[in-house]
Amino acid sequence: MDLKLPPTNPTNPQQAKTFMKSIEEDEKNKAEDLDIIKKEDIDEPKQEDTTDGNGGGGIGIVPTLQNIVATVNLDCRLDLKTIALHARNAEYNPKRFAAVIMRIRDPKTTALIFASGKMVVTGAKSEDDSKLASRKYARIIQKLGFNAKFCDFKIQNIVGSTDVKFAIRLEGLAFAHGTFSSYEPELFPGLIYRMVKPKIVLLIFVSGKIVLTGAKKREEIYDAFESIYPVLNEFRKN
């Protein structure tokens, strides 16, 4: 069964609405807790000094990584009922979703574990934490008696956010950059900006809050923000 998560690269208002809705929903004991990012993370994005060399290009703002989605192949068939019965912090409701949902606290992540042996891990804040969490889930499965391996680890999406701390004229931005932009405020309050290089989707809000998604590497998040910042500054509200 194909994994169905909120769109990681929203390209129209309906997808963007679904994307942001996933941010706002409560995660406790629900399949919907596989949010792209959590609401508390987006409400107050952190600002960091760029002197650490992590990006920002001298702007003085560095996007914060909010969520990393990775996939792993455990390379064996799994009995999901057995996993749900014997593993901690695991739930399985096949009528609702064809995967075991498992959580660990360190790194704080959630895994979707499928009978095919495929696994999706969400919630990590760094690439290293994503890989560490994925290995921990694989070890849990191994300890339950399955011949699980750790194959084909791949980061599928990195989400970042930031706040430029000034209001933005979204109508003007949409008009001037119509080739890349979609802005339909009656459907979704943010402007959807589809950057070509790097291939990143940005959700830009009038408040100055920005969500960046679709990256495979963190540098793509930083590069996209460096590229969009002068544009945002051009359409700063007085």
From Swiss-Prot:
Keywords: DNA-binding, Nucleus, Repeat, Transcription. It comes from the Eukaryota. Its main location: nucleus. CDD domains: TBP_eukaryotes (cd04516). InterPro entries: TBP (IPR000814), TBP_CS (IPR030491), TBP_dom_sf (IPR012295), TBP_eukaryotic (IPR033710). Residues 27-49 have a biased composition (Basic and acidic residues). Residues 1-58 are annotated as: Disordered. It is found in: Nucleus. GO terms for biological process: DNA-templated transcription initiation; transcription initiation at RNA polymerase I promoter; transcription initiation at RNA polymerase II promoter. Sequence repeats lie at residues 65-141, 155-232. GO terms for molecular function: DNA binding; DNA-binding transcription factor activity; RNA polymerase II core promoter sequence-specific DNA binding; RNA polymerase II general transcription initiation factor activity; RNA polymerase III type 3 promoter sequence-specific DNA binding. PANTHER family: TATA-BOX BINDING PROTEIN (PTHR10126). General transcription factor that functions at the core of the DNA-binding multiprotein factor TFIID. Binding of TFIID to the TATA box is the initial transcriptional step of the pre-initiation complex (PIC), playing a role in the activation of eukaryotic genes transcribed by RNA polymerase II. HAMAP family: TATA_bind_prot_arch. Belongs to the TFIID complex together with the TBP-associated factors (TAFs). Binds DNA as monomer. This is TATA-box-binding protein. It comes from Candida albicans (strain SC5314 / ATCC MYA-2876). The gene is TBP1.
